Structures are given as structure tokens and as C-alpha cells.
């Protein structure tokens, strides 16, 4: 059981090492980590989207050399709106909750999903963003998925 835990922790560490350069390259701030979740802030939805695409690309490339049982994937949710940022150590707010819901419960492997609020912030929305709607806990949730 210990070897399984250590293996999982090593995969999380490797994922962090692969993602952090993409976050920094696009001007993002890594605020906190929880297990395999990274909570980041960006100046714009466009830069968050660019970082997300870069992360998926980097993970896809590294998977070519990793054994299949060690492949790394990302499920990314991007939100936009008022948040409470506690000294770059923690984040709270509706859009934080929605983007977490998208990434943890709805997104498939290597999917990038945007909340509706994030989507409307894009000055040049891509035709590659497909509108989706899902019912979660009795609530209707509209989001946009970046087509691969």
C-alpha cells in the first residue's frame, strides 16, 4: 500500500513540474495546490486558456515517453469573476467553485472547459469552443468546451 501512495505522490510531483512552466510562461500565479489540483490566477481568460492549451500539449508530449500506467492528464476548468484571494494562498468565489466543478466532475482527460462568464470575456471567441449544457444537482450549468 505504501508503494502505491509513493507512486501516486511521484506522479503528482511530476505533473506539477510539467505544468508550472506553462503557468509562469503565460503570466499566471500558482496560488495553491490540493493533491493533483492546481489553483491559478491569470490576468485574462485568454492567457489562462493559452496556458491550459500549453499544459495539455506538454502532458501529451511527455506521455510518449512514459509507461502507459504513468501517463499524466489534465482536466481544466477556467472561470472568470469576483473572487476572494487571500494573500495568494487561497481562493474563494462562485467562479472558483464552478471551474472546480467543471474540471473535477465534468471534464474528460485533457479537456479544457470554460464557465459562461469566462467565455464572454474572450474578445475573439474561437469557433473551436463548443457550448454545452448539463444539469448538476438540479441546476442547469452552461459551459464551453475547447474542441480538440
For each feature predicted by the language model, list its residue ranges.
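Catalytic NTP-binding/metal-coordinating core of nucleotidyl cyclase/transferase enzymes
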Residues: 1-50
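Catalytic beta-strand-to-alpha-helix segment of the class III nucleotidyl cyclase homology domain
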Residues: 41-147
Amino acid at each position: 500500500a505504501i508503494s502505491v501512495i509513493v507512486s501516486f505522490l511521484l506522479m503528482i510531483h511530476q505533473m506539477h513540474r510539467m505544468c508550472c512552466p506553462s503557468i509562469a510562461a503565460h503570466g499566471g500565479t500558482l496560488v495553491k495546490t490540493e493533491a493533483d489540483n492546481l489553483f491559478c490566477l491569470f490576468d485574462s481568460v485568454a492567457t489562462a486558456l493559452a496556458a491550459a492549451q500549453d499544459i495539455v500539449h506538454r502532458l501529451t508530449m511527455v506521455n510518449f515517453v512514459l509507461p502507459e500506467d504513468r501517463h499524466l492528464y489534465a482536466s481544466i476548468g477556467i472561470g472568470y469573476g469576483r473572487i476572494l484571494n487571500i494573500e495568494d494562498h487561497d481562493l474563494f468565489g462562485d467562479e472558483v467553485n464552478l471551474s472546480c466543478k467543471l474540471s473535477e466532475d465534468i471534464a474528460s482527460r485533457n479537456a479544457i472547459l470554460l464557465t459562461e462568464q469566462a467565455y464572454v470575456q474572450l474578445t475573439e471567441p474561437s469557433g473551436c469552443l463548443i457550448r454545452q449544457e448539463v444539469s448538476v444537482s438540479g441546476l442547469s450549468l452552461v459551459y464551453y468546451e475547447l474542441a480538440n
